[in-house]
Every structure is written in C-alpha cells, then in structure tokens.
C-alpha cells in the first residue's frame, strides 16, 4: 500500500497587513485513511506472536535420532522393490497363491525381502499408526 500525502493548502491572509500570510494545510480524507491503515497494519504486526524456533530444533533432533532407522527402512524398501519385480519370474508369487496379491503372500509365507520390509516399516511406531498393517489374513 503506497502512502501518498495529499494535502489541501490554502493561504490565509492576516487581519493586519503587517503580518505575513500563513499557509494552512489539511490532509485529505484519502491520506487519513491510508495513514490509519498503515497504523493498523503496524499495530497488528507488533502484536503477532513470534515464531517458535524450539519446534524446528525438536524436529531436527528427532530426525537425527531416527536417521539409522530410516536408513535401514530405505535399504529394506530398495531390496523389497527388487524382490517385487522378480516375484513372478522367481516363482515366489504364482497364480493360485497370489489371489489376494503378492504383498499378502509375502507377509504370510515370508518372501525374503518383502516380508523383512513389511516388518521394518512398522518399527518405531505404535501398531495403530503403521500403514503396512493392510493384510486380509494374518498368521
């Protein structure tokens, strides 16, 4: 918001000619509104709460603490993705057994990398928040 000072100035003649003329300037209604808006904006900025740097520090500490677990999960997922791409070729996910999908078969029969990935995914979380607990039938 650009604040432009607009004023109306008028020369006022003194009653006696010995006095100098004075200039009286009055702000227009528009500039008063702009100044009032600027004042409200500055007041709101002063009353706004400061950013909490403690939250960022807590998140960084939590991330550093979970780094080893996250690296382990990332490696297991990489191996599991390779195993998923080879399940049909290797014969670990064949037709009669894969009716509910290869993930279900891997969880129940223990396909090497996929089953390990599913177990590691829920490590460090409570049972309710784990996204890998999708199975239709469990052991």
Swiss-Prot record:
Name assigned to this protein: Photosystem I reaction center subunit N, chloroplastic
Top-level lineage group: Eukaryota
Record's GO cellular component terms: chloroplast photosystem I
Sorted UniProt keywords: Chloroplast, Membrane, Photosynthesis, Photosystem I, Plastid, Thylakoid, Transit peptide
GO biological process: photosynthesis
Transit peptide, from-to: 1-53
Membrane topology: Peripheral membrane protein
Function text: May function in mediating the binding of the antenna complexes to the PSI reaction center and core antenna.
Protein's gene: PSAN
Cellular localization per UniProt: Plastid, Chloroplast thylakoid membrane
Matches recorded under Gene3D superfamilies: Chlorophyll A-B binding protein
Organism classification: Eukaryota, Viridiplantae, Chlorophyta, core chlorophytes, Chlorophyceae
Annotated Pfam families: PsaN
Record family assignment: Belongs to the psaN family.
């Amino acid at each position: 918001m650009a604040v432009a000072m607009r004023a109306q100035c008028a020369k006022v003649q003194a009653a006696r000619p010995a006095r100098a003329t004075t200039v009286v300037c009055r702000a227009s209604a528009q500039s008063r509104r702009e100044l009032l808006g600027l004042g409200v904006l500055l007041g709101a900025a002063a009353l706004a709460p400061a950013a909490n740097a403690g939250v960022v520090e807590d998140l960084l500490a939590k991330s550093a603490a979970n780094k080893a677990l996250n690296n382990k999960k990332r490696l297991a997922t990489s191996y599991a993705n390779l195993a998923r791409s080879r399940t049909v070729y290797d014969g670990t996910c064949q037709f009669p057994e894969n009716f509910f999908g290869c993930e279900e078969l891997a969880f129940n029969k223990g396909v090497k990398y996929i089953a390990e990935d599913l177990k590691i995914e829920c490590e460090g979380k409570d049972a309710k928040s784990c996204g890998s607990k999708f199975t239709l039938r469990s052991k």
